[in-house]
Structure formats: structure tokens, C-alpha cells
UniProtKB/Swiss-Prot annotation:
Function summary: Responsible for the transport of dicarboxylates such as succinate, fumarate, and malate from the periplasm across the membrane.
Protein name listed in UniProt: C4-dicarboxylate transport protein
Molecular function as annotated in GO: fumarate transmembrane transporter activity; malate:proton symporter activity; succinate transmembrane transporter activity
UniProt keyword Transport, yes or no: yes
InterPro entries documented for this protein: C4_dicarb_transport, Na-dicarboxylate_symporter, Na-dicarboxylate_symporter_CS, Na:dicarbo_symporter_sf
Region (Disordered): 421-440
Gene that encodes the chain: dctA
Family matches, as HAMAP family: C4_dicarb_transport
Places the protein is found: Cell inner membrane
Gene3D superfamilies from the UniProt entry: Sodium:dicarboxylate symporter
Any one GO CC term of the record: plasma membrane
Record keywords: Cell inner membrane, Cell membrane, Membrane, Symport, Transmembrane, Transmembrane helix, Transport
Biological process, per Gene Ontology: L-aspartate transmembrane transport
Source taxonomy: Bacteria, Pseudomonadati, Pseudomonadota, Gammaproteobacteria, Pseudomonadales
Principal localisation: membrane
Length: 440
């Protein structure tokens, strides 16, 4: 009989307590809250430090260990098809909701009175983003540069090529594959150590957010925030819930299964902070390593459902607030531009805002200076974006794994039914689904 873990040792409980204390401290002692920003930044940097090698090990191990290379192409094709369909639905839902609710109507903002200097950096970066530029940026100048910069797509591309090459070596490459598997264990053990600091990181990030922006300053733009949060919630429950139901599992049970990762994202506002744990969690759920290694990292650029909702809502909100007319032609143009622009949202720093700036510039009809209207609340909306993105990628992994018949359905059912035990040891699993021992 297993002994139940004490409540105070649960990462889930620790992060909830840390976020609550951070909110209270930021509200009552804002200067102290702002000063705690390095705690959140430091935690996110620690996570980012090991993301590139973990993706490399997971993808290479998954691809090189597969029997047939055809299955890799099949998995990638199905994943991209799923990403395109679901993210397009997210864009359309955001567009419909903002047109029905009209959160910016009646503000009558004069564009000439806005402080455009506050968004100049975002606008300049956005103007440089092109489809061709984005595609070329996927190819790293050097392998070392891809890992040094922590560019997920560049690391992913090299990892896929490396995995294919290692697979072609057959038994000759087996010692190298074993070494990569052992190196992965070291990386996941580092993650285990870093995750013990998650409550501290969440505390510092939340204290800074509330201390810097306050709660009272949100009243004027609270309507847009409320609409966005409700839309994201409905998208998860209705759209993603419908997809889950059609594939034989519950989105609510899946959310319960990844609750610790969701709380980490809530505290840090960075979905990247949960990426290493998501790789381990989805594999433990029953998805094959090769599927998890392709779908999760790729989804961080191509399956950003929360960001897609945000982009259409924010763009039309700016038009409404500045009394800029947007007829059906303008809105279709906006949608078509975002279908391309949103796919590179994770490839740049300050991604959501830069992609939004690029979109406003490309459409031409909307004032880029209008970004100043939502600059102050963007940080508060980032939590909903990140949470929706994370749930979306979890659903995508299960669905794609089912499509390519690389999902252990019995394991999926049992893990979701049990709610998933806390991920004490975030290491990759062996073929039997049992965490392997440390390398000796």
C-alpha cells in the first residue's frame, strides 16, 4: 500500500500558496513586489537553460529508435494538419467574439494622442517579420548557434536531421543513441532540481506583476480582459473539449492530469517553463516518445491557440477603440495575414506583441500606435494565452498519437482516471513505460 504524499510537499499546493502570497505582497507592498522580479526571471532562465538539450535528446531518441522512417513523416504531417485547423478555428472565434461583444466601442481614442514611443520597439521588430524571413530563420547559421540562442525551431530541425542520420547508421550508431539516452537522464534530473524552485519563481513573478501594474489600473480595459479570458475558457471547454470527446477522452481529466504544469505557467506567464515536464508527462500518459518529441516542441510555434484568439481580438479592439472602420473585406484580410503571421509567434522575443505589430503594419488599415492601448494589460492577458496554449498542445499530442496509432489507450484511460500522480521524477521512460534508473 502506497503512502500518500503530505499536502505541503505537493508542488501543486506549493505553487498555489506562492502565487497567493505574491498577489498579496504585490498589492500591499508594490515597491517590494517590483523588486522581486529577478526571482521570476531567474526561474524561467533556469528552465530555458535546459530546453534545447532536452528537445534534442527527446527527438533524436524517438526518431532513431523507430522501426520505420515513414512513420516520422506521417506524424509530422498529421501534426501540421491538426495545428492549421485548430489554430484557424481559434482565430475565427476571437474575431467573432470581439465583433459581437465590441469591448472597444465607445472609447473614441484619438490616435494622435497615444504615446507611440512606448510601442516603437515592437513595431520596428514587427515590420521586420516576413514569411520568407521566418522560414529561413528555421535554418540555423551554425549548430552551436541554435543551441546557444535557445531557438526551439532551429534546435528541432537539427534534431530531426540528426535522428534520421543516426537511424541510418543502424547498429553502428547504437552506442551513440545509448549515450544520448543517458545524457537525457542527466538533463531531466537537472529539471527535477530546478522545479523545486518553482514556488519561488511563481511568487516573484506574480509579486512583480501586481506590484508593477496594480489591480486598479485594469478597470478601464477590464472589459477586454474579461472577454478574452471567457473566450479562452469557452475555447478550451467547447472546441478542445469537443475534439477530446470525439477521440474518447475528457478535456477536464486531461487538465487535471497537467494541473501542476498549468500552475507553473500561471505563475510565470511562460508556457516554455513547463515544456520539459510536458515532454515527460505526455509520454507517461501513453503517447510514444517519437510523437511527443515532434508534436510538443513544434506546437510551441505552430499550435498557439490562446495567442491566436488574442491576436484577432486585440487587432479589432484597437480598431473599435480608435473608431477605425473595419468592414468584412478588412477583417478577412486580417484573418488571412494572421493565418501566416501567428505561426511564428514563438520564434521571437515578446512574440504576441511583435506579431500583432507586424499584422497591423501588413494590413495597413489599422493604427500601429494603437498598440499603446493594450500595452499595460498585455502582461495580465499573457496568463490566459499561455494556459490555453499549454492545454492545446496537450490535446494535440494525444489526438495526433491516436491518429498515427502510437497511443497506449489503456494507459491513457488509467492515467486520466487516477488524475496522474505528481511527477516526482521527470525523466524519460523506457519501452515499458517505467522510469529507468540513473546511468551507472
Amino acid at each position: 500500500m502506497t503512502t500518500r504524499q503530505p499536502l505541503y510537499k505537493s508542488l501543486y499546493v506549493q505553487v498555489i500558496i506562492a502565487i497567493t502570497i505574491g498577489i498579496l505582497l504585490g498589492h500591499y507592498y508594490p515597491e517590494t513586489g517590483v523588486a522581486l522580479k529577478p526571482l521570476g526571471d531567474g526561474f524561467v532562465k533556469l528552465i530555458k537553460m535546459v530546453i534545447a538539450p532536452i528537445i534534442f535528446c527527446t527527438v533524436v531518441s524517438g526518431i532513431a529508435g523507430m522501426q520505420s522512417m515513414k512513420s516520422v513523416g506521417k506524424t509530422g504531417g498529421y501534426a501540421l494538419l491538426y495545428f492549421e485547423i485548430v489554430s484557424t478555428i481559434a482565430l475565427i472565434i476571437g474575431l467573432v467574439v470581439v465583433n459581437v461583444v465590441k469591448p472597444g466601442a465607445g472609447m473614441h481614442i484619438d490616435v494622435s494622442t497615444l504615446n507611440a514611443s512606448s510601442v516603437a520597439a515592437y513595431a520596428a521588430a514587427g515590420a521586420q517579420q516576413t514569411t520568407v524571413g521566418f522560414l529561413l530563420n528555421v535554418i540555423p547559421n551554425t549548430v552551436v548557434g541554435a543551441f546557444a540562442n535557445g531557438d526551439i525551431l532551429q534546435v528541432l530541425m537539427f534534431s530531426v536531421l540528426f535522428g534520421f542520420a543516426l537511424h541510418r547508421l543502424g547498429s553502428y550508431g547504437k552506442p551513440l543513441l545509448d549515450m544520448i539516452d543517458r545524457f537525457a537522464h542527466v538533463m531531466f534530473n537537472i529539471i527535477n532540481m530546478i522545479m523545486k524552485l518553482a514556488p519561488i519563481g511563481a511568487f516573484g513573478a506574480m509579486a512583480f506583476t501586481i506590484g508593477q501594474y496594480g489591480v486598479g489600473s485594469l478597470v478601464q480595459l477590464g472589459y477586454l480582459m474579461a472577454c478574452f479570458y471567457i473566450t479562452c475558457l469557452l475555447f478550451v471547454l467547447v472546441v478542445l473539449g469537443g475534439i477530446c470527446r470525439a477521440h474518447g477522452f475528457s478535456v477536464l481529466k486531461l487538465i487535471r492530469y497537467i494541473r501542476e504544469e498549468l500552475l507553473i505557467v500561471l505563475g510565470t506567464s511562460s508556457s516554455e517553463s513547463a515544456l520539459p515536464r510536458m515532454l515527460a508527462k505526455m509520454e507517461r500518459l501513453g503517447a510514444k516518445k517519437s510523437v511527443v518529441g515532434l508534436v510538443i516542441p513544434t506546437g510551441y510555434s505552430f499550435n498557439l491557440d490562446g495567442t491566436s484568439i488574442y491576436l484577432t481580438m486585440a487587432a479589432v479592439f484597437i480598431a473599435q477603440a480608435t473608431d477605425t472602420t473595419m468592414d468584412i473585406t478588412h477583417q478577412i484580410t486580417l484573418l488571412l495575414v494572421l493565418l501566416v503571421a501567428s505561426k511564428g509567434a514563438a520564434g521571437v522575443t515578446g512574440s504576441g506583441f511583435i506579431v500583432l505589430a507586424a499584422t497591423l503594419s501588413a494590413v495597413g488599415h489599422l493604427p500601429v500606435a494603437g498598440l499603446a492601448l493594450i500595452l499595460g494589460i498585455d502582461r495580465f492577458m499573457s496568463e490566459a494565452r499561455a494556459l490555453t496554449n499549454l492545454v492545446g498542445n496537450a490535446v494535440a499530442t494525444v489526438v495526433v498519437a491516436k491518429w498515427v496509432k502510437e497511443m497506449d489507450n489503456d494507459k491513457l484511460a488509467s492515467e486520466l482516471a487516477s488524475g496522474g500522480a505528481p511527477l516526482v521524477d521527470a525523466r524519460p521512460t523506457d519501452d515499458l513505460g517505467v522510469a529507468e534508473g540513473p546511468a551507472r
